[in-house]
């Protein structure tokens, strides 16, 4: 299964290295070098993972992460940055990152962390949470069937609309 990864990294050499190895792992990689552009791409959705540098032109990675989470975008985020102090790692994770890797890094470690994130996400989607029924007033969302009804009448949604809803 091809997974979509958004790499938001201003160093073209690092971005190219990450993209090259992720492509070898059957990932479809989009690379963006400016924070604001990365935010727009991420909010457009459809990514299975975001690899995010912290020190970016246009918008810092922490602010980008904050905005994504404020918009209820819970795409897993792996922060990859030169900021290696404990306070930076803790801040990154508390801001909403799922993992944190400091530069310089081993490409093998990065790939192992990416695979671990994919495994966690896959196991989550196979749990009962993925099959739950969500009810809010007269709205019923059935995740397993990917269906929505309002007052008992089915609502036709595109896959993207359904993903945004849940």
What are the residue ranges of the model-derived segments?
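His-Asp phosphorelay/catalytic-motif detector in bacterial-type signaling
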Residues: 2, 46-48, 72-76
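Short, Lys/Arg-enriched segments at the junction into DNA-binding effector domains
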Residues: 3-4, 116-166
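Conserved sequence signature across two-component system core domains
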Residues: 8-9, 32, 50, 101
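Two-component/phosphorelay signaling modules centered on CheY-like receiver
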Residues: 11-30
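Short hydrophobic/Thr-rich beta-strand motif most characteristic of the beta2 strand and flanking loop
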Residues: 26-35, 41
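Acidic catalytic/metal-coordinating carboxylates
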Residues: 34-37, 60-63
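Basic, amphipathic DNA-recognition helix from helix-turn-helix-like DNA-binding domains
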Residues: 60, 66, 70-71, 76-135
């Amino acid at each position: 299964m091809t997974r979509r990864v958004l790499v938001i990294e201003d160093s073209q050499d690092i971005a190219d290295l990450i993209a090259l190895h992720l492509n070898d792992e059957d990932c479809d990689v989009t690379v963006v070098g400016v924070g604001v552009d990365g935010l727009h791409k991420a909010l457009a959705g459809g990514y299975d993972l975001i690899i995010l540098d912290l020190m970016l032109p246009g918008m810092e990675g922490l602010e980008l992460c904050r905005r994504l989470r404020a918009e209820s975008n819970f795409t897993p985020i792996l922060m990859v940055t030169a900021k290696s102090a404990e306070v930076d790692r803790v801040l990154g994770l508390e801001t909403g990152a799922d993992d944190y890797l400091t530069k310089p890094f081993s490409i093998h470690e990065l790939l192992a962390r990416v695979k671990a994130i994919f495994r966690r996400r896959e196991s989550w989607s196979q749990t009962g949470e993925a099959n739950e029924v969500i009810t809010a007033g007269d709205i019923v969302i059935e995740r397993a069937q990917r269906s929505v009804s309002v007052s008992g009448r089915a609502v036709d949604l595109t896959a993207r609309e359904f993903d945004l809803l849940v």
